[in-house]
Amino acid sequence: ITEGVLTRMIQQDPELTGIDAIVFDEFHERSIHSDFGLALALEVQSGLRDDLRLVVMSATLDIAPLQTLLNGFSLLPVVNLETQGRMFPVDVRYTRDVQAYELVAKTSNLIKQAVSEHDGDILVFLPGRGSINAVAREIKGLADSADIAVQMLYGALGKSAQQAAIAPDPQGKRKIILSTNIAETSLTIEGVTVVIDTLWENSAQYHPSSDITALTQQRISQA
């Protein structure tokens, strides 16, 4: 469930009847919703459910500040468990900046290049459903001729379609997965050897002149 659903569950049933533990996965993807969800869960544990277990998981988070926070609020002993991860060498290549108007054409060409130069499945990050459908049309001929399965992955897809994108192809075909950043940190897709990131995303932006919030295609930036 999402943090928003958890919040509504606590509002409707503050004791979280029938729930023994809450797992906060990928907690390094900090947001106001995840922080608020953890705060509410700690409040439930301290005030109503001293048996409620909270598990916070992350592959990259600095655990010390979080452990200090939990020690200050949790009624149960805070235990830190660490497991060794696996690292693989990654060859990073950059192309010139791609403008929005040429996004579909340039991405399609990069996919064709990756198909010819590399084995394994290809994961492509695109801004949204529109660009995903456009790229899928552009590479349809390539996919048909090379016996490649093209899968799409975005939030509005049904569960079965999302599972088809994540799971190995039942016929053993090579896959090209066209995805929004839904798969960037929260999913593991086996078999992927090439990742193409367009560095564009659709983000909700508020426009004060019209008092409307709308999806805007913009570059992804760490600034």
Question: What is each PLM-predicted segment?
Answer:
Residues I1-A223:
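P-loop NTPase motor module signature
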